[in-house]
Amino acid sequence: MNEFKLYHLPIVNETQYLGLASEEELMEARDMEIAIGALPISLLSTFTFENAHIYEVIRLFSELQLSVVPVLDQQKNYLGLVSINHLLNYTANLYAVNEPGGIIVLSISNRNNSLSHMSQIVEAENAQILSSYVSSFPDSTRLEVTLKINKTELSAIIASFERYDYEVKGVFNNSSHDDGSMDRFNSFMNYLNV
């Protein structure tokens, strides 16, 4: 458990899932010769089915503060587990984190939430939305929409959003290329000094 940084361990009897044990309870066991099934530990009966949606898995991790979620088939046979690292990698792929591009965060009214209109604005600038998600806030009528765009140069898209009265809350470009503007600026300054 320590090697993989796991704080929970699924307990199984062949393929039968018995429950989820916490690291704390397992560490309290003094006799290392006793089988885990014979230890006086309380087991969580938490699991997810193999066809569950990722949101269900995220909910279990969040609500129960788990480091792993056991995965069972429809006959409740143990198939494996999802670790927090697996979940993070899957979520990174889901939100196109590793794809090049920029991020635009919009603040909008919850009554004016039209993803199709936002998509039209982005596509009118010859770009595509790679991923999007919406955050809501308690006691607020505002939503925060985060758009991952397949371009790093976002000024035209931002101008279009502002033209349609969208509030641009933040812009993040993960551009690693140099467009040569610093070289041109330095050349211009050298020219002026001559």
Place the predicted regions along the sequence by residue.
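Short secondary-structure transition/capping segments
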Residues: 21-24, 35-36, 81-82, 93, ...
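A conserved regulatory-domain signal marking ACT and ACT-like small-molecule sensing domains
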Residues: 91, 101-194
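Histidine- and aromatic-rich ligand-binding microenvironments
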Residues: 10, 25-26, 86-87, 157-159, ...
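Short, structured interface segments
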Residues: 26-30, 75, 79-94
